[in-house]
From Swiss-Prot:
Name of the protein described by the UniProt record: Ribosomal RNA large subunit methyltransferase E
Family note: Belongs to the class I-like SAM-binding methyltransferase superfamily. RNA methyltransferase RlmE family.
EC code: 2.1.1.166
InterPro entries named among the record's database cross-references: NA-bd_OB-fold, RNA_methyltr_RlmE, RNA_MeTrfase_FtsJ_dom, rRNA-MeTfrase_E, SAM-dependent_MTases_sf, TRAM_dom
Lineage: Archaea, Methanobacteriati, Methanobacteriota, Stenosarchaea group, Methanomicrobia
Length: 255
């Protein structure tokens, strides 16, 4: 056994009956960001051997579905699926097991490491994108997402992709991550159900004035707050920060 496997968290996991030391990463992330709550329906991607599943079940007490390429030894109260998270058929299997929408999608999926930084980073980004795709399809509006990513030059683009879908996004390395590890966890809270996304451009007519004196344009029934705009004005706007119930936009051009 490698020496570094016998660290503090490794021994603690053995003592406390967790299948993997990574259990403590999920505990620490959840202590800080409170993504899994009592009753949450949780999907865990790349879940073998099952440390995160044990913690997710303790925290939620509700439906927990675990997916991995490898077989996961049965755990009480947890549905396990052997499948590839990059495949559509696996998503369908997870949806059937859930029988509804998920409150939280978590992914600790990691490729087999080749030792070549760029290759491992690219494979990790592929898995993180697959996890985001699944989260977008299975989460209820307002649901939360947690995903592991190996750092590298595609990380910032990936972070932007997550930011487009969630109202608040953080990147965090828990104390239980090994010092030498390139991993970082991205936490997305409050999946957006808005019909607009940050950076999009629209031509709109300002409908009304909000309480703060800014103009309000409606896009597919969704309120977009436009600074320095007056009712009746026809504008080309660029969407800025998007929240659950409204978005902000700036004026590009008066039409
Ligand atoms: C670090 S381990 C997960 C540890 C787990 N969170 C725990 O606490 O026990 C990463 C897992 O991702 C899985 N994995 C990698 N690629 C996958 C894929 N395409 N589909 C499903 N699982 C995958 C691996 O088989 C591996 O079990």
């Amino acid at each position: 056994m490698a020496r570094d496997q016998k660290d503090h968290y490794y021994r603690k996991a053995k003592e406390e009956g967790y299948r993997a030391r990574s259990a403590y990463k999920l505990k620490q992330i959840n202590d800080k960001f409170h993504i899994i709550r009592r009753g949450s329906r949780v999907v865990d991607l790349g879940a073998a051997p099952g440390g995160w599943l044990q913690v997710a079940r303790e925290l939620s007490g509700g439906i927990v579905v675990g997916v991995d390429l490898e077989r996961i030894e049965p755990l009480e109260g947890i549905v396990t699926i052997q499948g590839d998270i990059t495949k559509e058929e696996t998503l369908e299997q997870i949806a059937a097991a859930l029988g509804g929408q998920a409150d939280v999608v978590i992914s600790d999926a990691a490729p087999n490491l080749s030792g070549i930084w760029d290759v491992d980073h690219a494979r990790s980004i592929d898995l993180s994108r697959a996890a985001l795709r699944i989260a977008k399809r299975l989460l209820r509006p307002g649901g939360s997402f947690l995903v592991k990513v190996f750092q590298g030059d595609m990380f910032n683009d990936y972070l932007e992709e997550v930011k487009r879908e969630f109202s608040s996004v953080h990147a965090y390395t828990p104390p239980a991550s090994r010092k030498e590890s390139a991993e970082i966890y991205v936490i997305g809270k409050k999946l957006l159900s808005a019909p607009v996304r940050s950076g999009e451009i629209y031509d709109v007519t300002v409908d009304s004035v909000g309480r703060t004196g800014d103009g309000i344009a409606m896009i597919q029934g969704f309120a977009v707050i436009v600074k320095n705009a007056s009712p009746g004005e026809r504008l080309r706007i660029k969407i800025g920060p998007v929240k659950q119930r409204f978005a902000f936009a700036s004026i590009l051009e008066r039409l």
